[in-house]
Amino acid sequence: MWQKEEDKGEISIVKILDQNVVILMDPADVMNEEKVLGKNRTKEKQYAFDYAFDEDTPQQEVFKNTTKFLCEGVLNGYNSTVFAYGQTGAGKTYTMLGNEQNPGIMFNTMKEVFKQMKTHQVDRKYTIRVSFLEIYNENIKDLIMVSNEVLDLREDPIKGVCVAGLSEIEVHTPDEIFELLIYGNRNRTQEATEANQTSSRSHAVLQIICEYKEKDAGIKSEIKIGKLSLIDLAGSERAAKTGNRGLRMIEGANINKSLLALGNCINMLHENNIKNQSNYIPFRDSKLTRLLKDSLGGNCRTVMIANIAPSSSNYEDTHNTLKYANRAKNIKTNVQRNVLNVEHHIS
């Protein structure tokens, strides 16, 4: 909980059990420490996930239990996505980006990718490229090669959904990526609101493309391409709570619109999987959901990290986040290796 929440006399309404169960209590039932659990079980909400972390969990442990297992697949030509979802001020940017003292999932993932890559370099030649973009007010902008140009989403028959004109920087060490992360995050749109002093006003997407081919490949060779997308979503907002006016309110409305579109896609994918149906999924309702199309319903391994705020004033937002995360558990994707066949000409 934030200090300002404690100063207002707010209480924690969330408990973690056995590292995978989240219990959400109704604030009206939480009167003192003795009555936190079990007073009125009809109002308690319980959700089971693969892992549940409290506020004291080290960054490295979060990475190890959510993302580390994806790295080997990316190096072998499979797509993966990790995205942090939740209300504003719930710690999504800290989880994904972190800081110099406590790096988040983005940097820890890249360290692991380069570490595992070394074990394959005897018989493989790798190329690693990085891109970093933001979606701000439904406009896509490059966070590395900064300009006022708004980029377009395109449907590519081989790459799937991609961003036309987005820069991709070849990198050779995780430190290079960390420098790009810090630089790109400085270019990201951030403003203070009453709910969050460093509120991200955009969705940020870091993509790592890992290409490799066998060193002993002949005239005909295969290039395997794995793509890892690490996404820090802007947080859902309530105008009354954030105190937003003018441009901040417009930003908040666009953030909520894209998150609503994401929620609708999660709901439809959940329904399709539960009922074994193939109803239309409205991916085209926002730039965010178009970009996440493969991650949610296509050729990708995907991890959703739900960031929640445990204070009593955040009950509704926390409940909504947990419900979406619970539905997302039932979404199934179809993962396939990405192979590009190349024929070399001898002259």
Regions flagged by a language model, labelled:
Residues 1-90, 97-300, 307-309, 338-341:
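P-loop NTPase "switch/coupling" elements that transmit nucleotide state to mechanical/effector output
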Residues 94, 286, 317-320:
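Extracytoplasmic/periplasmic beta-strand context in beta-sandwich domains
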Residues 141, 313-316:
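Alpha-helical elements of the RecA-like P-loop NTPase motor core of helicases
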Residues 184-189, 323-329:
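Charged, low-complexity, helix-prone segments enriched in Lys/Glu/Asp/Gln
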Residues 217, 239-241, 315-316, 331-333:
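Extended hydrophobic-aromatic, low-complexity segments
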Residues 300-310, 319-320, 326:
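Extended, charged alpha-helical "arm/stalk" segments used for dimerization and assembly
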Residues 316-321, 327-347:
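Long, amphipathic alpha-helical segments that form or neighbor coiled-coils/leucine zippers used
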